[in-house]
Regions:
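Conserved beta-strand elements of beta-rich interaction domains across eukaryotes
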Residues: 12-13, 104, 118-120, 178-180
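N-terminal "mature-chain" segments and other terminal, solvent-exposed stretches
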Residues: 18-125
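Exoplasmic/lumenal beta-rich domain surfaces
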Residues: 119-157
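Internal, hydrophobic beta-strand segments that form the core of beta-sheet-rich folds
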Residues: 116, 153-182
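Sequence contexts marking disulfide-bonded cysteines in secreted/extracellular proteins
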Residues: 36-38, 70-77, 164-166, 170-172, ...
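Short beta-strand elements
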Residues: 183-195
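Extracellular Ig-like/FN3 beta-sandwich strand-entry sites
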Residues: 94-96, 108, 150, 166-170
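Fungal secretory targeting signals
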Residues: 1-23
């Protein structure tokens, strides 16, 4: 029995949590995500909502139900707007938006919070907030000295978005973190509109 348990324990250690947005409610998986990305990707995200993105392309490619033209795993882990219509936030230009992030396992690197056009997967304007280096530093994390502004912060909705983000599903606020040593990307998205 022990030889069977050890590989499972090792696997569990590789899929343990890393980070995600806690508030406002981030995109989550559902039927639309299964239809676009396949069950393998959705199961991976459901089993560990904070896992890194790098394992998803391989899972997607091996799933016969994966539709590359509908599921961009590098944007919100492929999670679809259609599963999150009840979670759309409405903001106004200039509004300050409080965001809370969970960091479970640190990997020092860089991070940013940006508004992303979901059709083109491009950042609109400049990042709303950026940590060019030193984000999620292991030494600080385990010493319980992680700067508070890495997990609880406010971003301001730009006043020059025009109508770009007036339709639900057109834009997301994306928290993006790259752990340099681990070479792993973590991301979480908030659906929103600007009224």
């Amino acid at each position: 029995m022990l030889p069977q348990i050890l590989p499972l324990a090792a696997f569990a250690a590789t899929v343990s949590a890393h980070g995600l947005i806690l508030s406002p409610t981030p995109r989550g998986p559902g039927d639309a995500s299964v239809a676009a990305c396949g069950q393998s990707v959705v199961d991976n995200v459901k089993n560990d909502k904070t896992s890194h993105v790098e394992g998803l392309p391989e899972l997607a490619a091996a799933d016969p139900d994966y539709k590359a033209d509908e599921c961009n795993v590098w944007l919100c882990k492929g999670l679809q707007y259609g599963d999150n219509t009840a979670n759309v936030q409405t903001y106004t230009a200039g509004q300050s938006v409080p965001i809370e992030v969970q960091l479970s396992i640190p990997h020092v690197g860089s991070a940013n919070v940006s508004i992303v056009d979901t059709k083109t997967d491009t950042i609109i304007g400049s990042p709303l907030l950026s940590w060019p280096s030193g984000y999620a530093d292991e030494r600080q994390f385990y010493a319980h000295t992680t700067p508070a502004n890495q997990t609880k912060f406010n971003v301001t909705i730009p006043d020059d978005l025009g109508t770009q983000c007036s339709e639900a599903g057109a834009c997301v606020i994306q928290w993006w973190w790259y752990g340099t040593g681990a070479r792993q990307t973590y991301e979480s998205c908030i659906d929103f509109t600007v009224a």
